[in-house]
Amino acid sequence: LVIDTLLESFAPEELGFTLDTYWVQMGGADVCSWIEKLSDRIPCVHLKDMAVKGWDPIMAPVGEGNLPWEKILQTLEKCGKTKYLLVEQDVCQESPFTCLEKSYNYLSSLGYK
């Protein structure tokens, strides 16, 4: 994989990544495995959830889709290098402010503020 070549060619302080939970899942990969693989290279993470409407994947507020958030957040804490968790939702099924509030409330219920 190209990413493996990048990891071998550059030190963590020379090359970092912004991991996007939705797109890792959409690509068919395991989010926690990628967090572990890039553990010392992810200063920020885009938190996006994935739900299914009919047969189609859609973006959802964090906590309303099928991503294992408690496991993801525990894995990030274990790796200990991520400074910023950024709630992001490219496409909203309702008001973006409502979606942001739902994501915030869910993450707050897990102790994140």
In which residue ranges do the predicted regions lie?
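Histidine-acidic metal/acid-base catalytic patches
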Residues: 1-19, 23-113
